[in-house]
Design a protein with these regions (language model features):
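Membrane-interface helix-loop junctions and terminal tails of multi-pass membrane proteins
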Residues: 1-297
Length: 297
């Protein structure tokens, strides 16, 4: 669905406007309006479909992302192989569907142009893909209180990548994105390898950076990012305890009066503690004693 919507927008943007080689460079790729139009279409389509399918398959539509998850020890190899196969088949189906439904040729193939060599295009694809994958690692793979917004960040990362790469390589960032239209068109450009080598190198770069951050325990550099230090939303009976908890987290000395008042309200460290019931002293009484428990005859 992601690629079908994106390919359709490319076709709507005009035949031979982008991604079509005429001489040595894509035609019309310098038009800012077209660049923004294509970039917005790909990023919004990806963000929406990641949000839809996040609970189903993890919202993965990119073999480079799948490989990076394997390298980051976040996905088994067998499952990754099945995902990559499904992604490639889906890209062919999406390109074929767009070509069959819309009039004229699809014109969604990517190609290196505008004075850029294939090697330069490969490295550009590598860095742009690495940026996208690092965004996925830090927003979706690493769980935090803003994880539910990960699709927005992923979509924006793809948007920026398209702004940079469309003019030079068509901004694939995804082997499946370049493979599907080539199969549907029945023609592979000689630089097709750029759109496999570049994104997969980006997978290694992003996974290596992610594992380095995990090894260095990046959480310690900026701790307590997921701790809610706001007491305004707490109930009145809990605000004293919340204030004491916040001061303790920030390393400040907590006045004894604050803790005592917090305990009086049956709240300690932000959690309710049931009041202790008074204990009745136990007095041992001998069976042969004629005295009562108060000590009087």
């Amino acid at each position: 669905m992601f690629l079908f919507m994106a390919f359709s927008v490319v076709s709507v943007s005009g035949h031979r406007v982008l991604f079509v080689r005429e001489g040595d460079s894509p035609v019309g790729a310098s038009d800012p309006t077209v660049i923004l139009y294509i970039a917005l279409a790909f990023s919004v389509s990806l963000g929406i479909n990641v949000w839809i399918f996040y609970r189903v398959s993890g919202g993965m539509f990119n073999p480079a992302v799948t490989l990076a998850l394997v390298l980051g020890n976040n996905m088994p190899i067998l499952r990754a192989a099945m995902c990559i196969l499904a992604q490639l088949v889906a890209s062919i189906a999406a390109a074929g569907l767009a070509q069959g439904l819309l009039p004229g040729p699809l014109n969604a193939q990517t190609t290196v142009g505008n004075g850029m060599t294939n090697v330069e295009g490969m490295f550009l694809e590598m860095f742009l893909t690495a940026q996208l994958i690092i965004t996925i690692f830090m927003l979706a793979v690493e769980k935090h209180k803003a994880t539910f917004l990960a699709p927005l960040g992923v979509g924006m990362a793809l948007f920026v990548g398209h702004l940079v790469g469309i003019y030079y390589t068509g901004a694939s960032l995804n082997p499946a994105r370049s493979f599907g239209p080539a199969v549907a068109a029945g023609h592979f450009y000689s630089d097709q390898w750029v759109y496999w080598a570049g994104p997969f190198l980006g997978s290694f770069l992003a996974a290596g950076f992610y594992r380095l951050l995990k090894f260095l325990q990046y959480e310690a550099a900026n701790p307590d990012q997921d701790v809610d230090l706001s007491c305004s939303a707490r109930e009145d009976s809990n605000r004293l305890a919340c204030t004491a908890e916040r001061m303790a987290i920030q390393g400040k000395d907590v006045p004894r009066s604050t803790w005592s008042r917090s305990k009086d309200s049956d709240v300690e460290m932000g959690s309710s503690i049931p009041p202790k019931s008074p204990q009745t002293p136990i007095v041992a009484v001998s069976p042969n004693s004629t005295d009562d428990i108060s000590g009087h005859a």
